[in-house]
């Protein structure tokens, strides 16, 4: 990031306007760190603006922030899942859980070890998830992988079934579904009713797993609206803020001072 900003500075010697998306629960120290990144190590005169990540997602999904009476967003990322409710132009409830794509990979590793006595790495688990991950019971596929035999310690090739992969994925999806249900129970009734009418917006890179929206719908009893932007939703929201002056209302600056 520093090298990219340094290159940009060579074309804009008077500084740039830099936008970051931040978690809702970011502390003052964490927010200050963004400014340090943008202006440290010989970088200078850059103005830093921040947009809360749920608001950026909402803008990307064309949710009318100022008039929304209650919209819920679920962003399933690599390491965590963020749950947020937006109403009257602000995030009123938000929390994150340590469950995402990487935890699914770990579960797949565990299932392969349990069913085949084979140790595989995170990259192999990720490839299996991408190739055979389906949150439905009709998926019947197989893939060959090479791993380390748990007993002999020697390399071994094995054919892995999609049911083994999906067992690991569904275990994590069950946790996410239970958290969403608990989250809705803590949401004010009138807002929860609006969310039930509108549906829950689903974004994030891990939302690419086929049938995840219907699976979570069965877990929670709510309908889900899957974003086709996936991992790009937050970036697309920032892009809209940069290009539209009216949307810059949702960005806030950091007080700048010499480091």
Regions found by a protein language model. Name each.
Residues 78-80:
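Short acidic, Gly/Ser-rich segments with clustered Asp/Glu that frequently serve as metal-coordination loops
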Residues 82-84:
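A structural feature that tracks compact, well-ordered secondary-structure segments
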Residues 1-73, 86-200, 207-234, 239-259:
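Nucleotide/phosphate-binding catalytic cleft detector across ATP-hydrolyzing
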């Amino acid at each position: 990031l520093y090298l990219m900003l340094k290159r940009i500075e060579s074309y804009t010697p008077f500084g740039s306007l830099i936008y970051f998306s931040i978690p809702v629960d970011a502390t003052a120290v964490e927010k200050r760190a963004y400014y340090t990144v943008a202006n440290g190590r010989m970088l200078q005169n850059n103005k830093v603006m921040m947009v809360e990540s749920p608001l950026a997602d909402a803008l990307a999904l064309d949710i009318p922030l100022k008039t929304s009476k209650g919209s819920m967003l679920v962003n399933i990322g690599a390491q965590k899942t963020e749950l947020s409710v937006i109403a009257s132009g602000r995030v009123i409830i938000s929390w994150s859980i340590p469950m995402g794509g990487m935890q699914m990979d770990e579960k797949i590793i565990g299932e392969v070890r349990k069913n085949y006595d084979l140790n595989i790495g995170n990259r192999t688990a990720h490839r299996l998830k991408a190739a055979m991950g389906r949150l439905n019971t009709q998926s019947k596929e197989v893939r060959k992988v090479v791993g380390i035999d748990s007993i002999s310690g020697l390399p071994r090739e094995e054919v892995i079934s999609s049911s083994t992969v999906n067992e690991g994925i569904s275990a994590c999806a069950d946790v996410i579904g239970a958290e969403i249900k608990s989250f809705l129970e803590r949401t004010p009734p009138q807002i929860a009713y609006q969310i039930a009418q509108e549906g829950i917006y689903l974004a994030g890179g891990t939302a690419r797993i086929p049938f995840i929206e219907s699976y979570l719908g069965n877990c929670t009893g709510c309908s889900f609206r899957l974003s086709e932007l996936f991992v790009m939703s937050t970036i697309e929201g920032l892009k809209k803020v940069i290009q539209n002056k009216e949307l810059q209302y949702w960005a806030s600056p950091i007080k700048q001072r010499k480091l």
